[in-house]
Amino acid sequence: MNRETVSVNIKTLPPGPNARKWSEFHRRYAARSTYHEGFVWDRSKPAIGPFCTDVDGNVILDFVSHVASSALGYNHPELVRMASKLQAVDPDRYAGCDFIGAWGEDPEKMEIPTPSHLHYKLMELTSQFGFGSAFFSNSGAEAVENAMKICYDHKQNYGYGICFYGAFHGRTLGALSLNRSKKIQRDWFPQIPNIVDFPYCTCRDHPCQC
């Protein structure tokens, strides 16, 4: 892929057969959320500037621009040169909670695991709980917020939340109610009711002497 001459090239109208294969593989254990199934980015294929390649070989113009966080595009020569000089990992950040990222054409024959494969691994590790799907969040605060929503949905807005002294769970509004690290983090903000805090048990004795 040449930075100066590359252009959009659609070989197979998306979603092509490989994209459908990856989408089906991904949907098995991924909770339905904002994933866009029409485009499956093949991260083993060339990407340069604002162009990237999907699993069916289509060269796509990326209007997302890394969600506006990296407008220089993919594989900027100066960034690649500096990363190589520092022996650093190639700069790579994509919206893994929004796009299905593939590595190769077949999810069953991948060289590098993807977020889709992590869903399968999570189901394996938590099989004793009977979960049917996994949901990835962009940050710890988002994970806490979604966990709180699941609890409220299960209890139908009834019950208590528990946190520990010194806890920090994030700066989003719901997570602030669980923070006990600094008082200023909760001042003047509305609080979710029925949050109870406890000292964290550090006792090594059995039975516990806390």
Can you describe what each PLM-predicted range is?
Residues 119-210:
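PLP-dependent aspartate aminotransferase-fold enzymes
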Residues 1-37:
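Short, compositionally biased leader-like segments
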Residues 41-64:
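Active-site and channel-lining beta-strand-loop segments
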Residues 5-11, 16, 59-156:
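Glycine-rich loop-to-alpha-helix module at the N-terminal edge of alpha/beta enzyme cores
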Residues 53, 73, 175-179:
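Short beta-strand-to-turn element immediately C-terminal to the catalytic PLP-Schiff-base lysine
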Residues 34-37, 45-48, 130:
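Short, basic and Ser/Thr-rich N-terminal targeting/leader segments
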Residues 36-40, 184:
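Short, P/G- and charge-enriched loop/turn segments at secondary-structure junctions
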